[in-house]
Amino acid sequence: MNKCRLLKKKKLNKLRNELDSLDNTLLKIIKKRTAIVKQVLKLKDYKYQIVDKKRIKIILNRIKKKSIKNKIDPKITNHIWKNMIKSYIDYERRNFKKK
């Protein structure tokens, strides 16, 4: 392997390690977010309260604005947030207990 290729491989491994570290941080944040969602779910009396379309729209608009302000592709963040919201809606539906 030539020197240039070796340096690229080393740099690639370093960047992948940084991504792995960020993934670990994201997992901690997701754990914290899930704990809050559990608390929110306990406050909901009816299953229809799980999906709040107005709030979802507000969240997605806020994330879009912040993404643009921070020079992040809003298509990426929109996709991430929509999937996260869908996942938590599914989680709430599976864990909803009638009172």
PLM features: residue spans?
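Domain-level signature for soluble enzymes in the chorismate/prephenate branch of the shikimate pathway
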Residues: 1-99
